[in-house]
Structures are given as structure tokens and as C-alpha cells.
Regions:
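C-terminal, active-site-flanking charged/polar segments
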Residues: 173, 178-182, 186, 193-195, ...
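Outer-membrane beta-barrel proteins
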Residues: 127-131, 135-178, 197-205, 210, ...
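Extracellular/periplasmic, surface-exposed regions of secreted and cell-surface proteins
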Residues: 23, 112, 277, 319-328, ...
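A surface-exposed, glycine/aromatic-enriched loop/edge motif typical of exported proteins
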Residues: 200-246, 337-391, 500-520, 601-635, ...
Length: 1019
């Protein structure tokens, strides 16, 4: 038995368009006045007037989430708040998303913010996620966006200090809907069409093979020119054959003559229009004594990839509040979600979809992927797998046929989740009330992964995994709030709280490989011998308790001072951790005479100290599972060979402490021109001290490393939020809104440690490197002299450096959005354009497709004179003239006038033109070469993130069909247009999902654009 390591990532969200508001001057879209009654929800789930806040917070109303049409809260918040960076893993149904607020704050821990729903912390974990496998979900996707009343993003340390070691990455505070006075019923239905928004283009001129000649089962597409063939394959009728399930026969090819290019047909085998139905029903009621909100929803999505790609989420919610008497109020918030999905294999994965699809030669037809192989003697092999590397299916293919990946492999996830929050509020004094809140968040996830016999690679003999993950968090929260009068001009609100939390994750399951019965689907461990069975289990738990106090001073209703302090104890470190904060807001216009130019102004400053708790159990030296990996996504499990565990070579540290983040923030919120223009400015800088690392120690200690508080990081940045009321009248309103965020991150100190691997491969990875931004791209570089010029070989080609180093930065220079919304009579509209500039990405797919001769640039041609051809050489040192004389029509040919036309291109690296052809791209110039620097690409983008239109039908129409509350219809488009220089898929992607490693593309599944049509009835 082995102990399976779980990757647990606490993930998160952002902010929405037509409902955005920066705390301060009440700058919600469509608002042109200072609403002194506007409230925001604080880190502990209570409310506070936005005027009195001295730190940055962004707010979105629930309708802004729903109008986006996204399945998940995270995705719905994209583009709506400054310095809130959200990256979707892929376009797969239910795929998770990474959220980062004001840069990265830890190396070994999670950079995802804390999620608080109705005052209790909940999980947004994403278990799994690596360079291969399937894209994982974020557990925040279990929430129905239609149930949400508002979302607040607390960015800085001062805003979130009461959460101590869970607050370094900010806090997302979600408030769900409550019942309202009277009775109302709402039903909405949405139909959506999803399409691939960006694809790799494949060349269709040259066929399978090498050296300009067709070669059966060859990996590459460096073969002959397809158009110059004779038109029909020559078949050996007496040879081996493959008979597809539909009866189509494929014989042994003696000579390739077929001129057909199958790129379009193979593409259509993979992609379709994805379809989604989303239905929501909610009931709201309320009176003076009680209120109730109940909802049911069903999200049913079929992905853009044909086959087993789907996602279905069914939710139910009940929120209830009862005033028992004038002192006691009780309530219950309860949510249930059932999420079932099928995912498609991706990434560095011989069984992955894009790897097999994109590498397929343009002259190979992928249509018939399953059937029976017959030897020349007529001996059959059933359930044979036909692909371009095994065109007769005589053995497991090197790479899966996409049809096999889509239809034969199974990767299911079945999640059941409950979130319960009973709460009681007792007013024990006219100026004091006590809130008692219990939270319980529990989920189970059963994942089944099945590779039938004849899948590619290590799965050739079949494998099956049944994986059960159970996660829960229980919290008990007591809050006492009081109001005090300290004089005629000074008011004080006090809060004292205690919070206990217990979190645990339990994982149990097993794998079976090398199936005994090979010709049947066997989802059972019995179909494997004992030595090929691999059970696993793991358990982790974390306890913490925290006491805190908050003092809010209000001086003359214009100066607002908040002081907080929290003391926390946790099972992951020894001593208590103290996190103080202070914030000050001053309404400048209270002391100035208002003018037409300046309607409102508030200055704010805040500082705070929060932390990141060390990972569980590193205070002790543990035993770990034995295994080994080449660094390219494979893994050798020692438990299969008699060596399951060993004492870790990394020594525990009983003195380990939380990582400490100290942050200072300065800002201003202003309204100009009679409240028509609202602006928010924030500058911040923070320092993270004592980030946890495994630091090398002398071998004489018996260990190679020890956990220590050894690293320092820092962030600094600027945020601008804007809202402009362009037109305001009874029938027509028009508003311009937007935000801009810039963050600069630096790994200041690693205490002499080598660059820390975060994610990726042996050749290219994302790392923490001292003196560079967190997540910097690391890999092989070109050799250069002291002046920076390339060092060339004798033929004029660049050479590889013997040293690896930083080759790119996945972090953007800035990110922002600009929106326009408004209404004309019953018509409402919203347009949101978002941009991300200066970020780089490793285009691993692009590099490998160069190696395979698939990229269009590898099929380009050039013509030179015979004299020039005698002096131009390829990477082997062979002249162009010599290659043409060899007569391979896919390499170079002699024209009637004596000139020579060749496949490839010419490039001058500094010593004259050289010939870039197969021999360059399959060595140093391709994706399997040692120089990753050449595949670092600009991944900047600008997109139409969202376009929505809705129309409320005339009341007479709705009354005629007995819908008194009204009927509205709407349209939403997502990612309708994308402008980017990045080659291949939408650069809003990441190979390793929500991990700390960023900027990696290696056969990632593509992104989507969507068209949604909605109708809503209010009864």
C-alpha cells in the first residue's frame, strides 16, 4: 500500500461588470450620487457603511454574476476588479480557474484567497492537477451564481487581518440571497452554444514520413508532397489488415498514393458545438417576523469535444430567518450540490486528446479508430486501436487516436456537497448583540479513471482507478458587537470574536493495471493480479482557533479609524500568531466647500500583518511514498516493486512559523462634476518574510534538506477603478466603467537555495528564482558571448548554452478592463472588454509541432538559384544543392530553370543564411531540443469578455399570460473576439491548473466562446 500525496489548492474568484462598486464614493455602475447608506460585507460576514472603510474593497451584486452566463462564480467575476487575476485552466466543462489578488505571496503554500460564504469559511480546493491527466474543478463551482446576493473582494492585509494565517491572499466574501417581504417566484431558463475560440492551424501540404519520403507509422510529417502523388494507395491484398467496427477495411500499404488531406475531417472528429441548458427556480417570501429563500437549479452542459465531455450540477438552497422575539433571531443557510462530470485527458499524456490529434499527419484519416486486426495468416486481434502510428492497429499506438480518447476512456467525477450554516443572534443589551454561527462544509468526490486495453503508452494493457476524496471543514464562530458613545463627536463600534475551525481531507482508493481479461471493459479490481493492484490512502487534518477584536472609531462623521488584532493558534506551528491592522479614512469634502468640480473626496491609509500557515506535518520528519519520475509526466511507483515508503530526506522543523505578510496601502476615492465621475486610486506594497522552503543541509545530519522559514517575497502595485455617468434621463442611461491594475512581484531572498521548481518539466518549468518574479519561466538558453550575441557553430547555426536560466515571465505588466452599460426604456445592455499585457508563456505545443512538421511554418517553401544553393547548408551541414540532387520531393527539388525550391525557410543568425528544415526542427530548433528560450512567446491578449442584452417585455404582454412580475428575454456573448499574437490556443490557460506554476502550454485543451439565450419569468 502506498500513501498517496494530495495536491490541495484553495482557489477563488474576482468581480463583475454592470454591478461593480469600489468602496468609497459609492461608484456602482449607474450610480451618480454618493449613497451614504451603501453597505459592504466585512471579512467576518457583518455589514459596514462603505464611507467608513479605510482600505480597498471591490463589490459586485449577484445580478452581475448571472448576466455573465458563467457556470462558476470565479469565471463570472473575471475582469471586474483591479489586480484580481483570473486564469481558466481550459475550456472543458466545469474546469477550475486560478485567482490571484495583488500577486503571489507564498512559494510552497496556496496563493488562492480565502472564501467566506455567509460568514463561514468554505473550501475552494482543487485536488490533482499536473502536467498530464484531466483538468480539475474548483469546488467554488458547486455554488449556483443565481443564489448569490453580493460578492466583496477584500484585497489588502488590513481588510482581512482577523483571518490571520488564512488572509495573506485576500478574502472573497460571498453573501447569498435572503427572502424579501411578500411572495415572489422566479423561473429562468438559459440555452447556450459553446464553440472553440482558437485552434492550432495544421499544414496540409506534406504527408507522413521523413526525409521527404512517406514512411508508414512514422511520428513525423516530413514526408513527400501530398499533391504530387498518383492518387491511389497500392495495397498488398495478401497482407495484414484492419477491419473497422463499421466494416471498412484498411489493408497493408505498399506505396502511398492517396492525395486526400484529412485535416478538416480529423478536426470534425474532435469538435462540436457544446450545448448547455441552465434552469433556475427560486421562491422568496418574507414578513416582519421571518423570511425564506428557496431555490433549485440544474446546469446541464455538453462540452465542445465529441464524446465523454460533460458537466451537470444540480443544487438546492434554503435560507431561513426567524425573529423569535425582540431579542433573539435564528436562521439557517443550507446548500446542497450534486455535480457529475466526464473529463478528457490532456497535457503531456500519450493518452491525451490534443497530443494525439495535433501530431496526426495531414494525410491520415482518424475516422475508424476501433476494430479488429488480422495478421496476414488471418489471426484476429479484437478491440484493436488504429492510429497514425499504428495504421493497422497491430499493437497499442504510440499516441492515442483522438476518437479512442474521446469515446473509450472514462474519467468521471461524482461530487456530493453540503454546506450548513445555522446562526443565532441574541441582543443581550440595548447596545450589544451576540452572534453564534456554526458552519459545516462537507463534500465527497468519487473519481473513476479507466483506460481500456490497447490505449497508448503505459496504459497499453489496461488500467482502472477508483479514487474517493472526502473533505470537510467545521467552524464555530462567536461574535459580540457593541456600540459606545465616547462623547458628542466620537462613536465607537466594538467587535470581539472567537473562531474555531477543524479541517480534514481523507483519500482512499486503488488502481489496477495489466488486465487479465483483455477484450472486455472491466471496471473491477478483480481483473488484475495482486502484484498489479495498488491501493492507496491518506488523511490530513488541521485545527485552529482564533480570538480577535475590532475597534471602529467615528470622529465627527468624517474621520474613521479601525484597529484590529487577532491571536491565532494552529496545529501546523507551535507558538501563537498575532495579526494586527489599522486603517484610517478621512472624508476631505466634509471640511471643504463642495464645488461643481469636486463632489466628494476620501483619503485612506491602512496597514496590516497577516500570514500563511505552514503546510501540515512539516514540523515533524515523515515517511513518504517511494517513486521516481523522468520529469516528463511519467511516474514509477515503488510500491509495485516491494519498496513502498521511506523516511523523508527532508527533516521536519518543530520551530517552523507562519509566513508573515506586512502590507501598507494608500488610496483615495473621489467624485467629480456633480458626482458624474467616480475614481478610486490605490497604491500598495507588501513584504512576505519567512516563506517556508526546504533548505539544503549537510549530509552528515542524515538529511539532504530541512524545512525552514527561509525565503522573502515582495509585491507592489497600483490600482485604478473608474465609473462615469455619461447620460442620465428617465428613459436613457449610459455609463462607462473600468479598472486597471499593475503588480510587481519579486522573490527577494531564497537563503542560498537553488531556484524552486513549481510546475512543469525537466526541460522547461515555472520556478521561484531569487531576484526575479515568482513563477518565472526556466529552461535552456542560447549560448551568447559577453556582448549578448549568439555563439554560432561552423555552419552558422546557434548553439545551446550549458547553463539553464530564466527565459520568461508569465506575470503581466498590467491588466485592465473597460465597460459600457446602460438602458433605453426596457432594453438593458452591457459590454466588457478586457486586456492583459506583457505576460509571456512557454509555447510547448508550438515547439513540438515544429518538431513533427505540423506547424504551417514548417511547410513553407523558398526558391534560390543553383549558385546560392551550393552555399546554403542545413543543420547536418548538407548543402541545399546536394539535398535536391538526392531527389526527395518533400525536401528539395530542381526546377526547369535550374533554381532549387525547398521545404523550410532561410534564416540569418549572424553568419549568413542557413536552411531551417527537418534536421533543424527535430534537433536543437524543435520542441524536444534543449533550448526552451526560443518558445517563450508574448501571451498578451485583448478580448470582448462579455456582451449582454436584455429586454423586459411590456407589462400588458406579461399580464396577458398571467405573469404579473414580468417577463424578460436576453442574450449574452462571452469571449466573442480575441486578439493575441500567441500561437495556438487561447493564452488564458495553464497546463497545471490552479498550481503556483504559471505560463505553461503543452497540449492544453482549448478555450471557448459562448452564445447564451435567456428567458425569465417573475410571478
Amino acid at each position: 500500500m502506498r500513501m498517496k500525496h494530495l495536491l490541495m489548492v484553495i482557489s477563488a474568484s474576482s468581480i463583475a461588470p454592470a454591478a461593480f462598486a469600489q468602496a468609497g464614493p459609492g461608484s456602482g455602475s449607474g450610480s451618480d450620487t454618493v449613497d451614504v447608506g451603501t453597505v459592504t460585507v466585512t471579512a467576518i460576514g457583518t455589514t459596514k457603511n462603505v464611507r467608513k472603510i479605510g482600505y480597498s474593497v471591490s463589490q459586485v451584486q449577484g445580478k452581475g454574476l448571472v448576466s455573465s452566463g458563467e457556470s462558476g462564480v470565479i469565471q463570472a467575476l473575471t475582469g471586474k476588479a483591479s489586480n484580481v487575476q483570473i486564469t481558466r485552466s481550459t475550456g472543458d466543462p466545469g474546469a477550475g480557474a486560478y485567482i490571484q489578488i495583488r500577486g503571489q505571496n507564498t512559494i510552497t503554500g496556496s496563493n488562492q484567497p480565502l472564501i467566506v460564504v455567509d460568514g463561514i469559511p468554505v473550501s475552494n480546493s482543487s485536488f490533482g492537477g499536473g502536467t498530464d491527466g484531466v483538468v480539475q474543478q474548483s469546488r467554488l463551482n458547486d455554488l449556483n451564481p443565481s443564489d448569490i446576493e453580493s460578492v466583496e473582494v477584500l484585497k489588502g492585509a488590513a481588510a482581512a487581518a482577523v483571518w490571520g494565517t488564512r488572509a495573506a491572499n485576500g478574502v472573497i466574501v460571498i453573501t447569498t440571497k435572503k427572502g424579501k417581504r411578500g411572495m415572489s417566484i422566479e423561473f429562468s431558463s438559459t440555452y447556450a452554444i459553446d464553440q472553440v475560440n482558437r485552434e492550432y492551424e495544421k499544414q496540409g501540404k506534406y504527408g507522413q514520413g521523413s526525409g521527404g519520403r512517406w514512411v508508414a507509422n512514422n511520428a513525423n510529417s516530413w514526408g513527400d508532397q501530398i499533391a504530387l502523388r498518383n492518387g491511389k494507395d497500392s495495397i498488398n491484398a495478401a497482407g495484414a489488415k484492419f477491419v473497422a467496427d463499421d466494416g471498412t477495411v484498411y489493408g497493408t500499404i505498399v506505396r502511398k498514393g492517396d492525395k486526400t488531406v484529412y485535416n478538416d475531417q480529423n478536426r470534425d472528429q474532435v469538435f462540436r458545438n457544446g450545448i448547455t441548458w441552465n434552469n433556475n427556480l427560486s421562491i422568496s417570501s418574507g414578513s416582519d417576523k421571518s423570511n425564506m429563500f428557496f431555490s433549485l437549479s440544474d446546469w446541464n452542459q455538453q462540452g465542445i469535444m465529441k464524446g465523454l465531455s460533460d458537466y451537470r450540477r444540480t443544487t438546492a438552497r434554503l435560507n431561513f430567518t426567524q425573529n423569535v422575539n425582540d431579542k433573539l433571531t435564528v436562521g439557517l443557510n443550507a446548500n446542497m450540490a450534486k455535480t457529475v462530470s466526464n473529463r478528457i485527458q490532456m497535457g503531456s499524456n500519450l493518452d491525451g486528446l490534443y497530443l494525439g490529434y495535433l501530431r496526426t499527419s495531414p494525410d491520415f484519416d482518424n475516422s475508424d479508430y476501433k476494430g479488429t486486426y488480422y495478421t496476414a495468416a488471418g489471426v484476429p486481434s479484437f478491440n484493436a486501436h488504429r492510429g497514425y502510428r499504428r495504421y493497422l492497429g497491430n499493437a497499442a499506438p504510440t499516441y492515442n487516436n483522438p476518437g479512442w480518447t474521446l469515446n473509450e476512456q472514462t474519467n468521471t467525477s461524482d461530487v456530493t456537497r453540503f454546506i450548513l450554516t445555522p446562526e443565532a443572534t441574541y441582543k443581550w443589551h440595548e447596545n450589544h448583540k451576540l452572534i453564534a454561527r456554526l458552519g459545516h462544509d462537507m463534500s465527497t468526490d468519487r473519481r473513476i479513471t479507466y483506460f481500456p486495453v490497447n490505449s497508448a503508452g503505459s496504459q497499453a494493457n489496461g488500467s482502472f482507478t477508483d479514487d474517493h476524496i472526502q473533505e470537510s471543514e467545521t467552524s464555530l464562530h462567536f461574535i459580540n458587537q457593541g456600540t459606545h458613545k465616547l462623547g458628542s463627536d466620537i462613536n465607537l463600534n466594538s467587535t470581539v470574536g472567537y473562531l474555531y475551525t477543524y479541517r480534514n481531507v481523507y483519500n482512499i482508493g486503488g488502481s489496477a493495471s495489466q488486465f487479465i481479461i483483455r477484450d472486455q471493459d472491466r471496471f473491477a479490481f478483480i481483473n488484475s493480479t495482486t502484484e498489479n493492484k495498488d491501493p492507496f490512502n491518506s488523511f490530513s487534518e488541521l485545527l485552529s482557533n482564533r480570538v480577535y477584536g475590532i475597534l471602529d472609531f467615528d470622529v465627527k462623521d468624517k474621520i474613521f479609524l479601525q484597529l484590529t488584532g487577532a491571536s491565532e493558534a494552529s496545529s501546523t506551528y507551535a507558538s501563537r500568531f498575532f495579526s494586527p491592522s489599522a486603517s484610517l479614512a478621512y472624508e476631505l469634502t466634509k471640511d471643504l466647500k463642495p464645488t461643481d468640480l469636486l463632489s466628494y473626496a476620501k483619503l485612506r491609509v491602512s496597514t496590516g500583518r497577516v500570514g500563511v500557515a505552514p503546510p501540515a506535518y512539516i514540523w515533524n520528519t515523515n515517511f513518504v511514498a517511494a517513486g521516481s519520475s523522468s520529469g516528463w509526466g511519467d511516474y514509477l511507483d515503488g510500491s509495485l516493486y516491494g519498496g513502498s515508503i521511506y523516511r523523508s530526506s527532508t527533516q521536519g522543523n518543530p520551530d517552523i512559523k507562519p509566513e508573515i505578510k506586512t502590507e501598507t496601502e494608500l488610496g483615495a476615492d473621489v467624485k467629480l462634476f456633480k458626482n458624474k465621475v467616480s475614481l478610486g486610486f490605490t497604491y500598495y506594497q507588501n513584504k512576505i518574510d519567512g516563506a517556508v522552503l526546504a533548505i539544503a543541509v549537510a549530509n552528515s545530519t542524515g538529511y539532504s534538506n530541512q524545512w525552514k522559514n527561509a525565503a522573502d517575497l515582495s509585491n507592489k502595485g497600483l490600482e485604478i477603478d473608474m465609473n462615469v455617468s455619461l447620460i442620465k434621463s428617465d428613459n436613457f442611461n449610459l455609463n462607462l466603467y473600468g479598472n486597471l491594475g499593475r503588480n510587481r512581484n519579486t522573490v527577494d531572498n531564497l537563503s542560498g537555495a537553488a531556484p524552486i521548481f513549481l510546475a512543469g518539466f525537466t526541460g522547461t518549468s515555472s520556478r521561484a528564482v531569487e531576484g526575479h518574479a515568482m513563477g518565472s519561466l526556466w529552461g535552456g538558453k542560447w549560448a551568447r558571448d559577453e556582448s549578448g550575441k549568439l555563439i554560432l557553430d561552423a555552419s552558422g547555426f546557434p548553439t545551446a548554452s550549458s547553463q539553464e536560466g530564466v527565459i520568461g515571465n508569465p506575470n503581466p505588466n498590467y491588466r485592465g478592463s473597460l465597460g459600457l452599460n446602460g438602458n433605453y426604456k426596457n432594453l438593458n445592455f452591457n459590454l466588457l472588454v478586457e486586456t492583459c499585457q506583457g505576460n509571456q508563456m512557454w509555447a510547448g505545443t508550438y515547439g513540438v509541432l515544429n518538431n513533427f512538421g505540423i506547424n504551417p511554418e514548417t511547410a513553407s517553401e523558398f526558391t534560390v538559384s543553383a549558385a546560392d544553393a551550393a552555399n546554403i547548408v542545413d543543420y547536418r551541414g548538407v548543402t541545399l544543392a546536394s539535398a535536391a540532387a538526392a531527389g526527395a520531393n518533400g525536401l528539395a527539388t530542381v526546377n526547369a530553370d535550374g533554381s532549387i525550391t525547398a521545404r523550410g525557410s532561410l534564416k540569418d543568425y549572424g553568419a549568413g543564411n542557413v536552411w531551417l528544415n527537418q534536421y533543424w526542427y527535430t534537433s536543437l530548433g524543435g520542441g524536444f531540443g534543449s533550448v526552451a528560450e526560443q518558445f517563450i512567446k508574448d501571451a498578451s491578449w485583448t478580448r470582448i469578455r462579455e456582451l449582454s442584452l436584455s429586454y423586459a417585455l411590456p407589462k400588458a404582454w406579461s399580464d396577458a399570460v398571467h405573469v404579473p412580475g414580468g417577463i424578460s428575454v436576453g442574450f449574452t456573448g462571452r469571449n466573442l473576439a480575441l486578439w493575441t499574437k500567441f500561437d495556438g490556443v487561447d493564452p488564458e490557460t495553464n497546463l497545471t491548473g490552479v498550481s503556483n506554476g504559471r505560463g505553461l502550454d503543452y497540449f492544453n485543451n482549448p478555450g471557448t466562446k459562448s452564445y447564451l439565450f435567456n428567458i425569465k419569468f417573475n410571478l
